[in-house]
Amino acid sequence: MLPPILEVFVVFHPGDAVGDRVAQTLLNRFRGNAYSGLIGGAIDVYVRPASASRDPAGAPRPLPCVEALPYGVLPPALTAIVLVAGTELAATLTYPGPWRDYVQALADARAADSEHVGLFNVCVDPNVFDRTEFGRIVGHVQGIGDGEVDTQAFCASVCRDLAQGIAQMGRDAPDQISVFLSHTKRLSDVEEEQVSDLVSLVRNEIANTRLNEFFDAQAIQPNADWKPAIDAAAAKGALLAVRTDRYSSREWCQREILMAKRAGMPVVILDALTVGEERGSFVMDHVPRTPARLENGIWRRSDVVNVLGHLVDECLKRVLWRKQQQIAAGVQLPVDIDWWALLRIFEIPHWRSPNFPRCRVGW
């Protein structure tokens, strides 16, 4: 049995009711279909609001990153602490006591091992960090989540920011995840300005997140060779394909997806077909898709928000998959690691690649 790869702990004061809703949002996200392709036990989500003692004012049980687990149980490779910053918790930390010691221990654990322990503040009430003991302890740590609390947009941003932060903490991603925006400027007879409007909307939404962007028209510098620049960027970034009517028929669009898949990079498709495709392409198979819809002639912003969330989920899945592979290499398993570790990427584009490692299990 492999030790857990990622454990997410949602910590909040029982008096801050929004903490329950944040916890439920994260439980649904990390236990849902988005992460169902990982080997069992890769992700666990725990909620820590209640006192660990009979004292109702007491703090929750210590986390494994603070106090070692009994019986030699191994800690997870990555620990993400989601601290819901509400007014009740801020008030409790004003005076010395078990909750202040508990939150201080979380901050100390992050400071001692920031490559494996992350602290992600979710500020659900304004001014909780302003000239408070709470702010002194954790206010210097960049939080997650944007927008009005309890809205769908806020919940989506919390999930996306958390997944991005964990992926970057896993050291399998650059300091900032970069989105390679793949699209075609060739339009069908009925698309007109709709495609450019959608691409602009996607770019605006990326700009409103903590994600970086590679967009060929702006990223490739004058006097640079654009072909190798695009190949290199597609092999290093998380690829978001805006699939319009002519997308699958464009050679360079297929090439960009092919480069990303061969490099093992995440790929997600935003389906924005108006009439449909006259031809398809096998290189676009086996990747998550999100439909883009028009309402009164305007692209729905929520569809773009959803596809960016799915793309970041794929980035985190890639990090966790590789962590599992690294850990499994050092333990005795009843199956050959070469078999299950490569199932994630068994596709024709990889088989045709001369660098693709051959599996020892026959198919």
Language model regions located:
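Short, acidic/glycine-rich phosphate-metal binding loop used to engage nucleotide
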Residues: Q218-I220, D245-S248
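Short glycine-rich, flexible loops that bind phosphorylated cofactors or substrates
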Residues: L89-A91, Y247-S249
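Short glycine-/small-residue-rich Rossmann-like dinucleotide-binding loops
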Residues: A85-T87, T244-D245
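Conserved N-terminal substructure of TIR/SEFIR domains
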Residues: M1-G86, T94-R100, A111-E115, N127-F129, ...
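Charged, amphipathic alpha-helical linkers/stalks
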Residues: E277, F282-M284, T290-A328
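Glycine-rich, charge-decorated loop segments at or immediately adjacent to ligand/cofactor-binding or catalytic sites
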Residues: P126-V141, W226, V275-P291
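Generic beta-sheet signal
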Residues: V122-D125, V242, L270-A272
